[in-house]
Amino acid sequence: MTESKAVIPGSFDPITYGHMDIIERVAQRFDEIHICVLKNSNKEGTFTVEERMALIEASVADIPNVEVHQFNGLLVDFCDEVGAKTIIRGLRAVSDFEYELRLTSMNKKLNSDVETLYMMTSTNYSFISSSVVKEVAQYKADISEFVPEPVEKALKEKFGK
């Protein structure tokens, strides 16, 4: 039997419990998970790509089949590089789907061997986004139920306690 590999792409600026929910569930279904940290040219990052990677690595340290990578380029090229045929995209709400469908269609056109699977974030996390967490953190509110501990600490340092 061949080893199953999946890619979970995102900017992860920063990683949240919504992301962790998807990662943990995917890790139970695939042999290898490759988290691909992408630089979003449309967004100014709060954390550098290297900082985001470190926060993800600290957050997924207990999940043995997860690797964290940085990649600048086409996602389907990254999939080829790691030998993955599956991209996993998390959806919080139906409103996420239209954008995701356009990405999926383009990826399929670029590499017909790569499939995209969608997973709904668990209801407990469906309202969490990196942007909202950062906004709340700027006002010194408690974000411990939205992000892993290393991220909470990093956001407090970034925005002052």
Curated annotation (Swiss-Prot):
Gene source species: Staphylococcus carnosus (strain TM300)
| Record key words, sorted | ATP-binding, Coenzyme A biosynthesis, Cytoplasm, Magnesium, Nucleotide-binding, Nucleotidyltransferase, Transferase
Identify the cofactor(s).
Answer: Mg(2+)
User: Per its UniProt entry, which superkingdom is the organism in?
Assistant: Bacteria
Is this entry keyworded ATP-binding?
yes
Outline what the protein does.
Reversibly transfers an adenylyl group from ATP to 4'-phosphopantetheine, yielding dephospho-CoA (dPCoA) and pyrophosphate.
Top EC class for this record: transferase
Name the GO terms of the biological process aspect.
coenzyme A biosynthetic process
EC number(s) in its UniProt entry?
Answer: 2.7.7.3
Q: Which reaction does it catalyse?
A: (R)-4'-phosphopantetheine + ATP + H(+) = 3'-dephospho-CoA + diphosphate
Where along this sequence does the record place binding of substrate? Answer: 11, 43, 75, 89
State the Gene Ontology terms under molecular function. ATP binding; pantetheine-phosphate adenylyltransferase activity
Residues the record annotates as the site (Transition state stabilizer) are 19
Question: How does this protein assemble?
Answer: Homohexamer.
> Can the keyword ATP-binding be found in this entry's annotation?
yes
Q: What gene is behind this protein? A: coaD
* Intracellular or extracellular location(s): Cytoplasm
Name the protein family.
Belongs to the bacterial CoaD family.
Principal cellular location given in the protein's record: cytoplasm
Q: Which residues cross the membrane?
A: none
Which Gene3D superfamilies does the protein's record reference? HUPs
Q: Which GO terms describe its cellular component?
A: cytoplasm
What lineage is this protein's organism placed in? Bacteria, Bacillati, Bacillota, Bacilli, Bacillales
Pathway the protein acts in: Cofactor biosynthesis; coenzyme A biosynthesis; CoA from (R)-pantothenate: step 4/5
Q: What is this protein called?
A: Phosphopantetheine adenylyltransferase
- InterPro entries from the UniProt entry: Cyt_trans-like (IPR004821), PPAT (IPR001980), Rossmann-like_a/b/a_fold (IPR014729)
Quote the record's binding site residues for ATP. Answer: 11-12, 19, 90-92, 100, 125-131
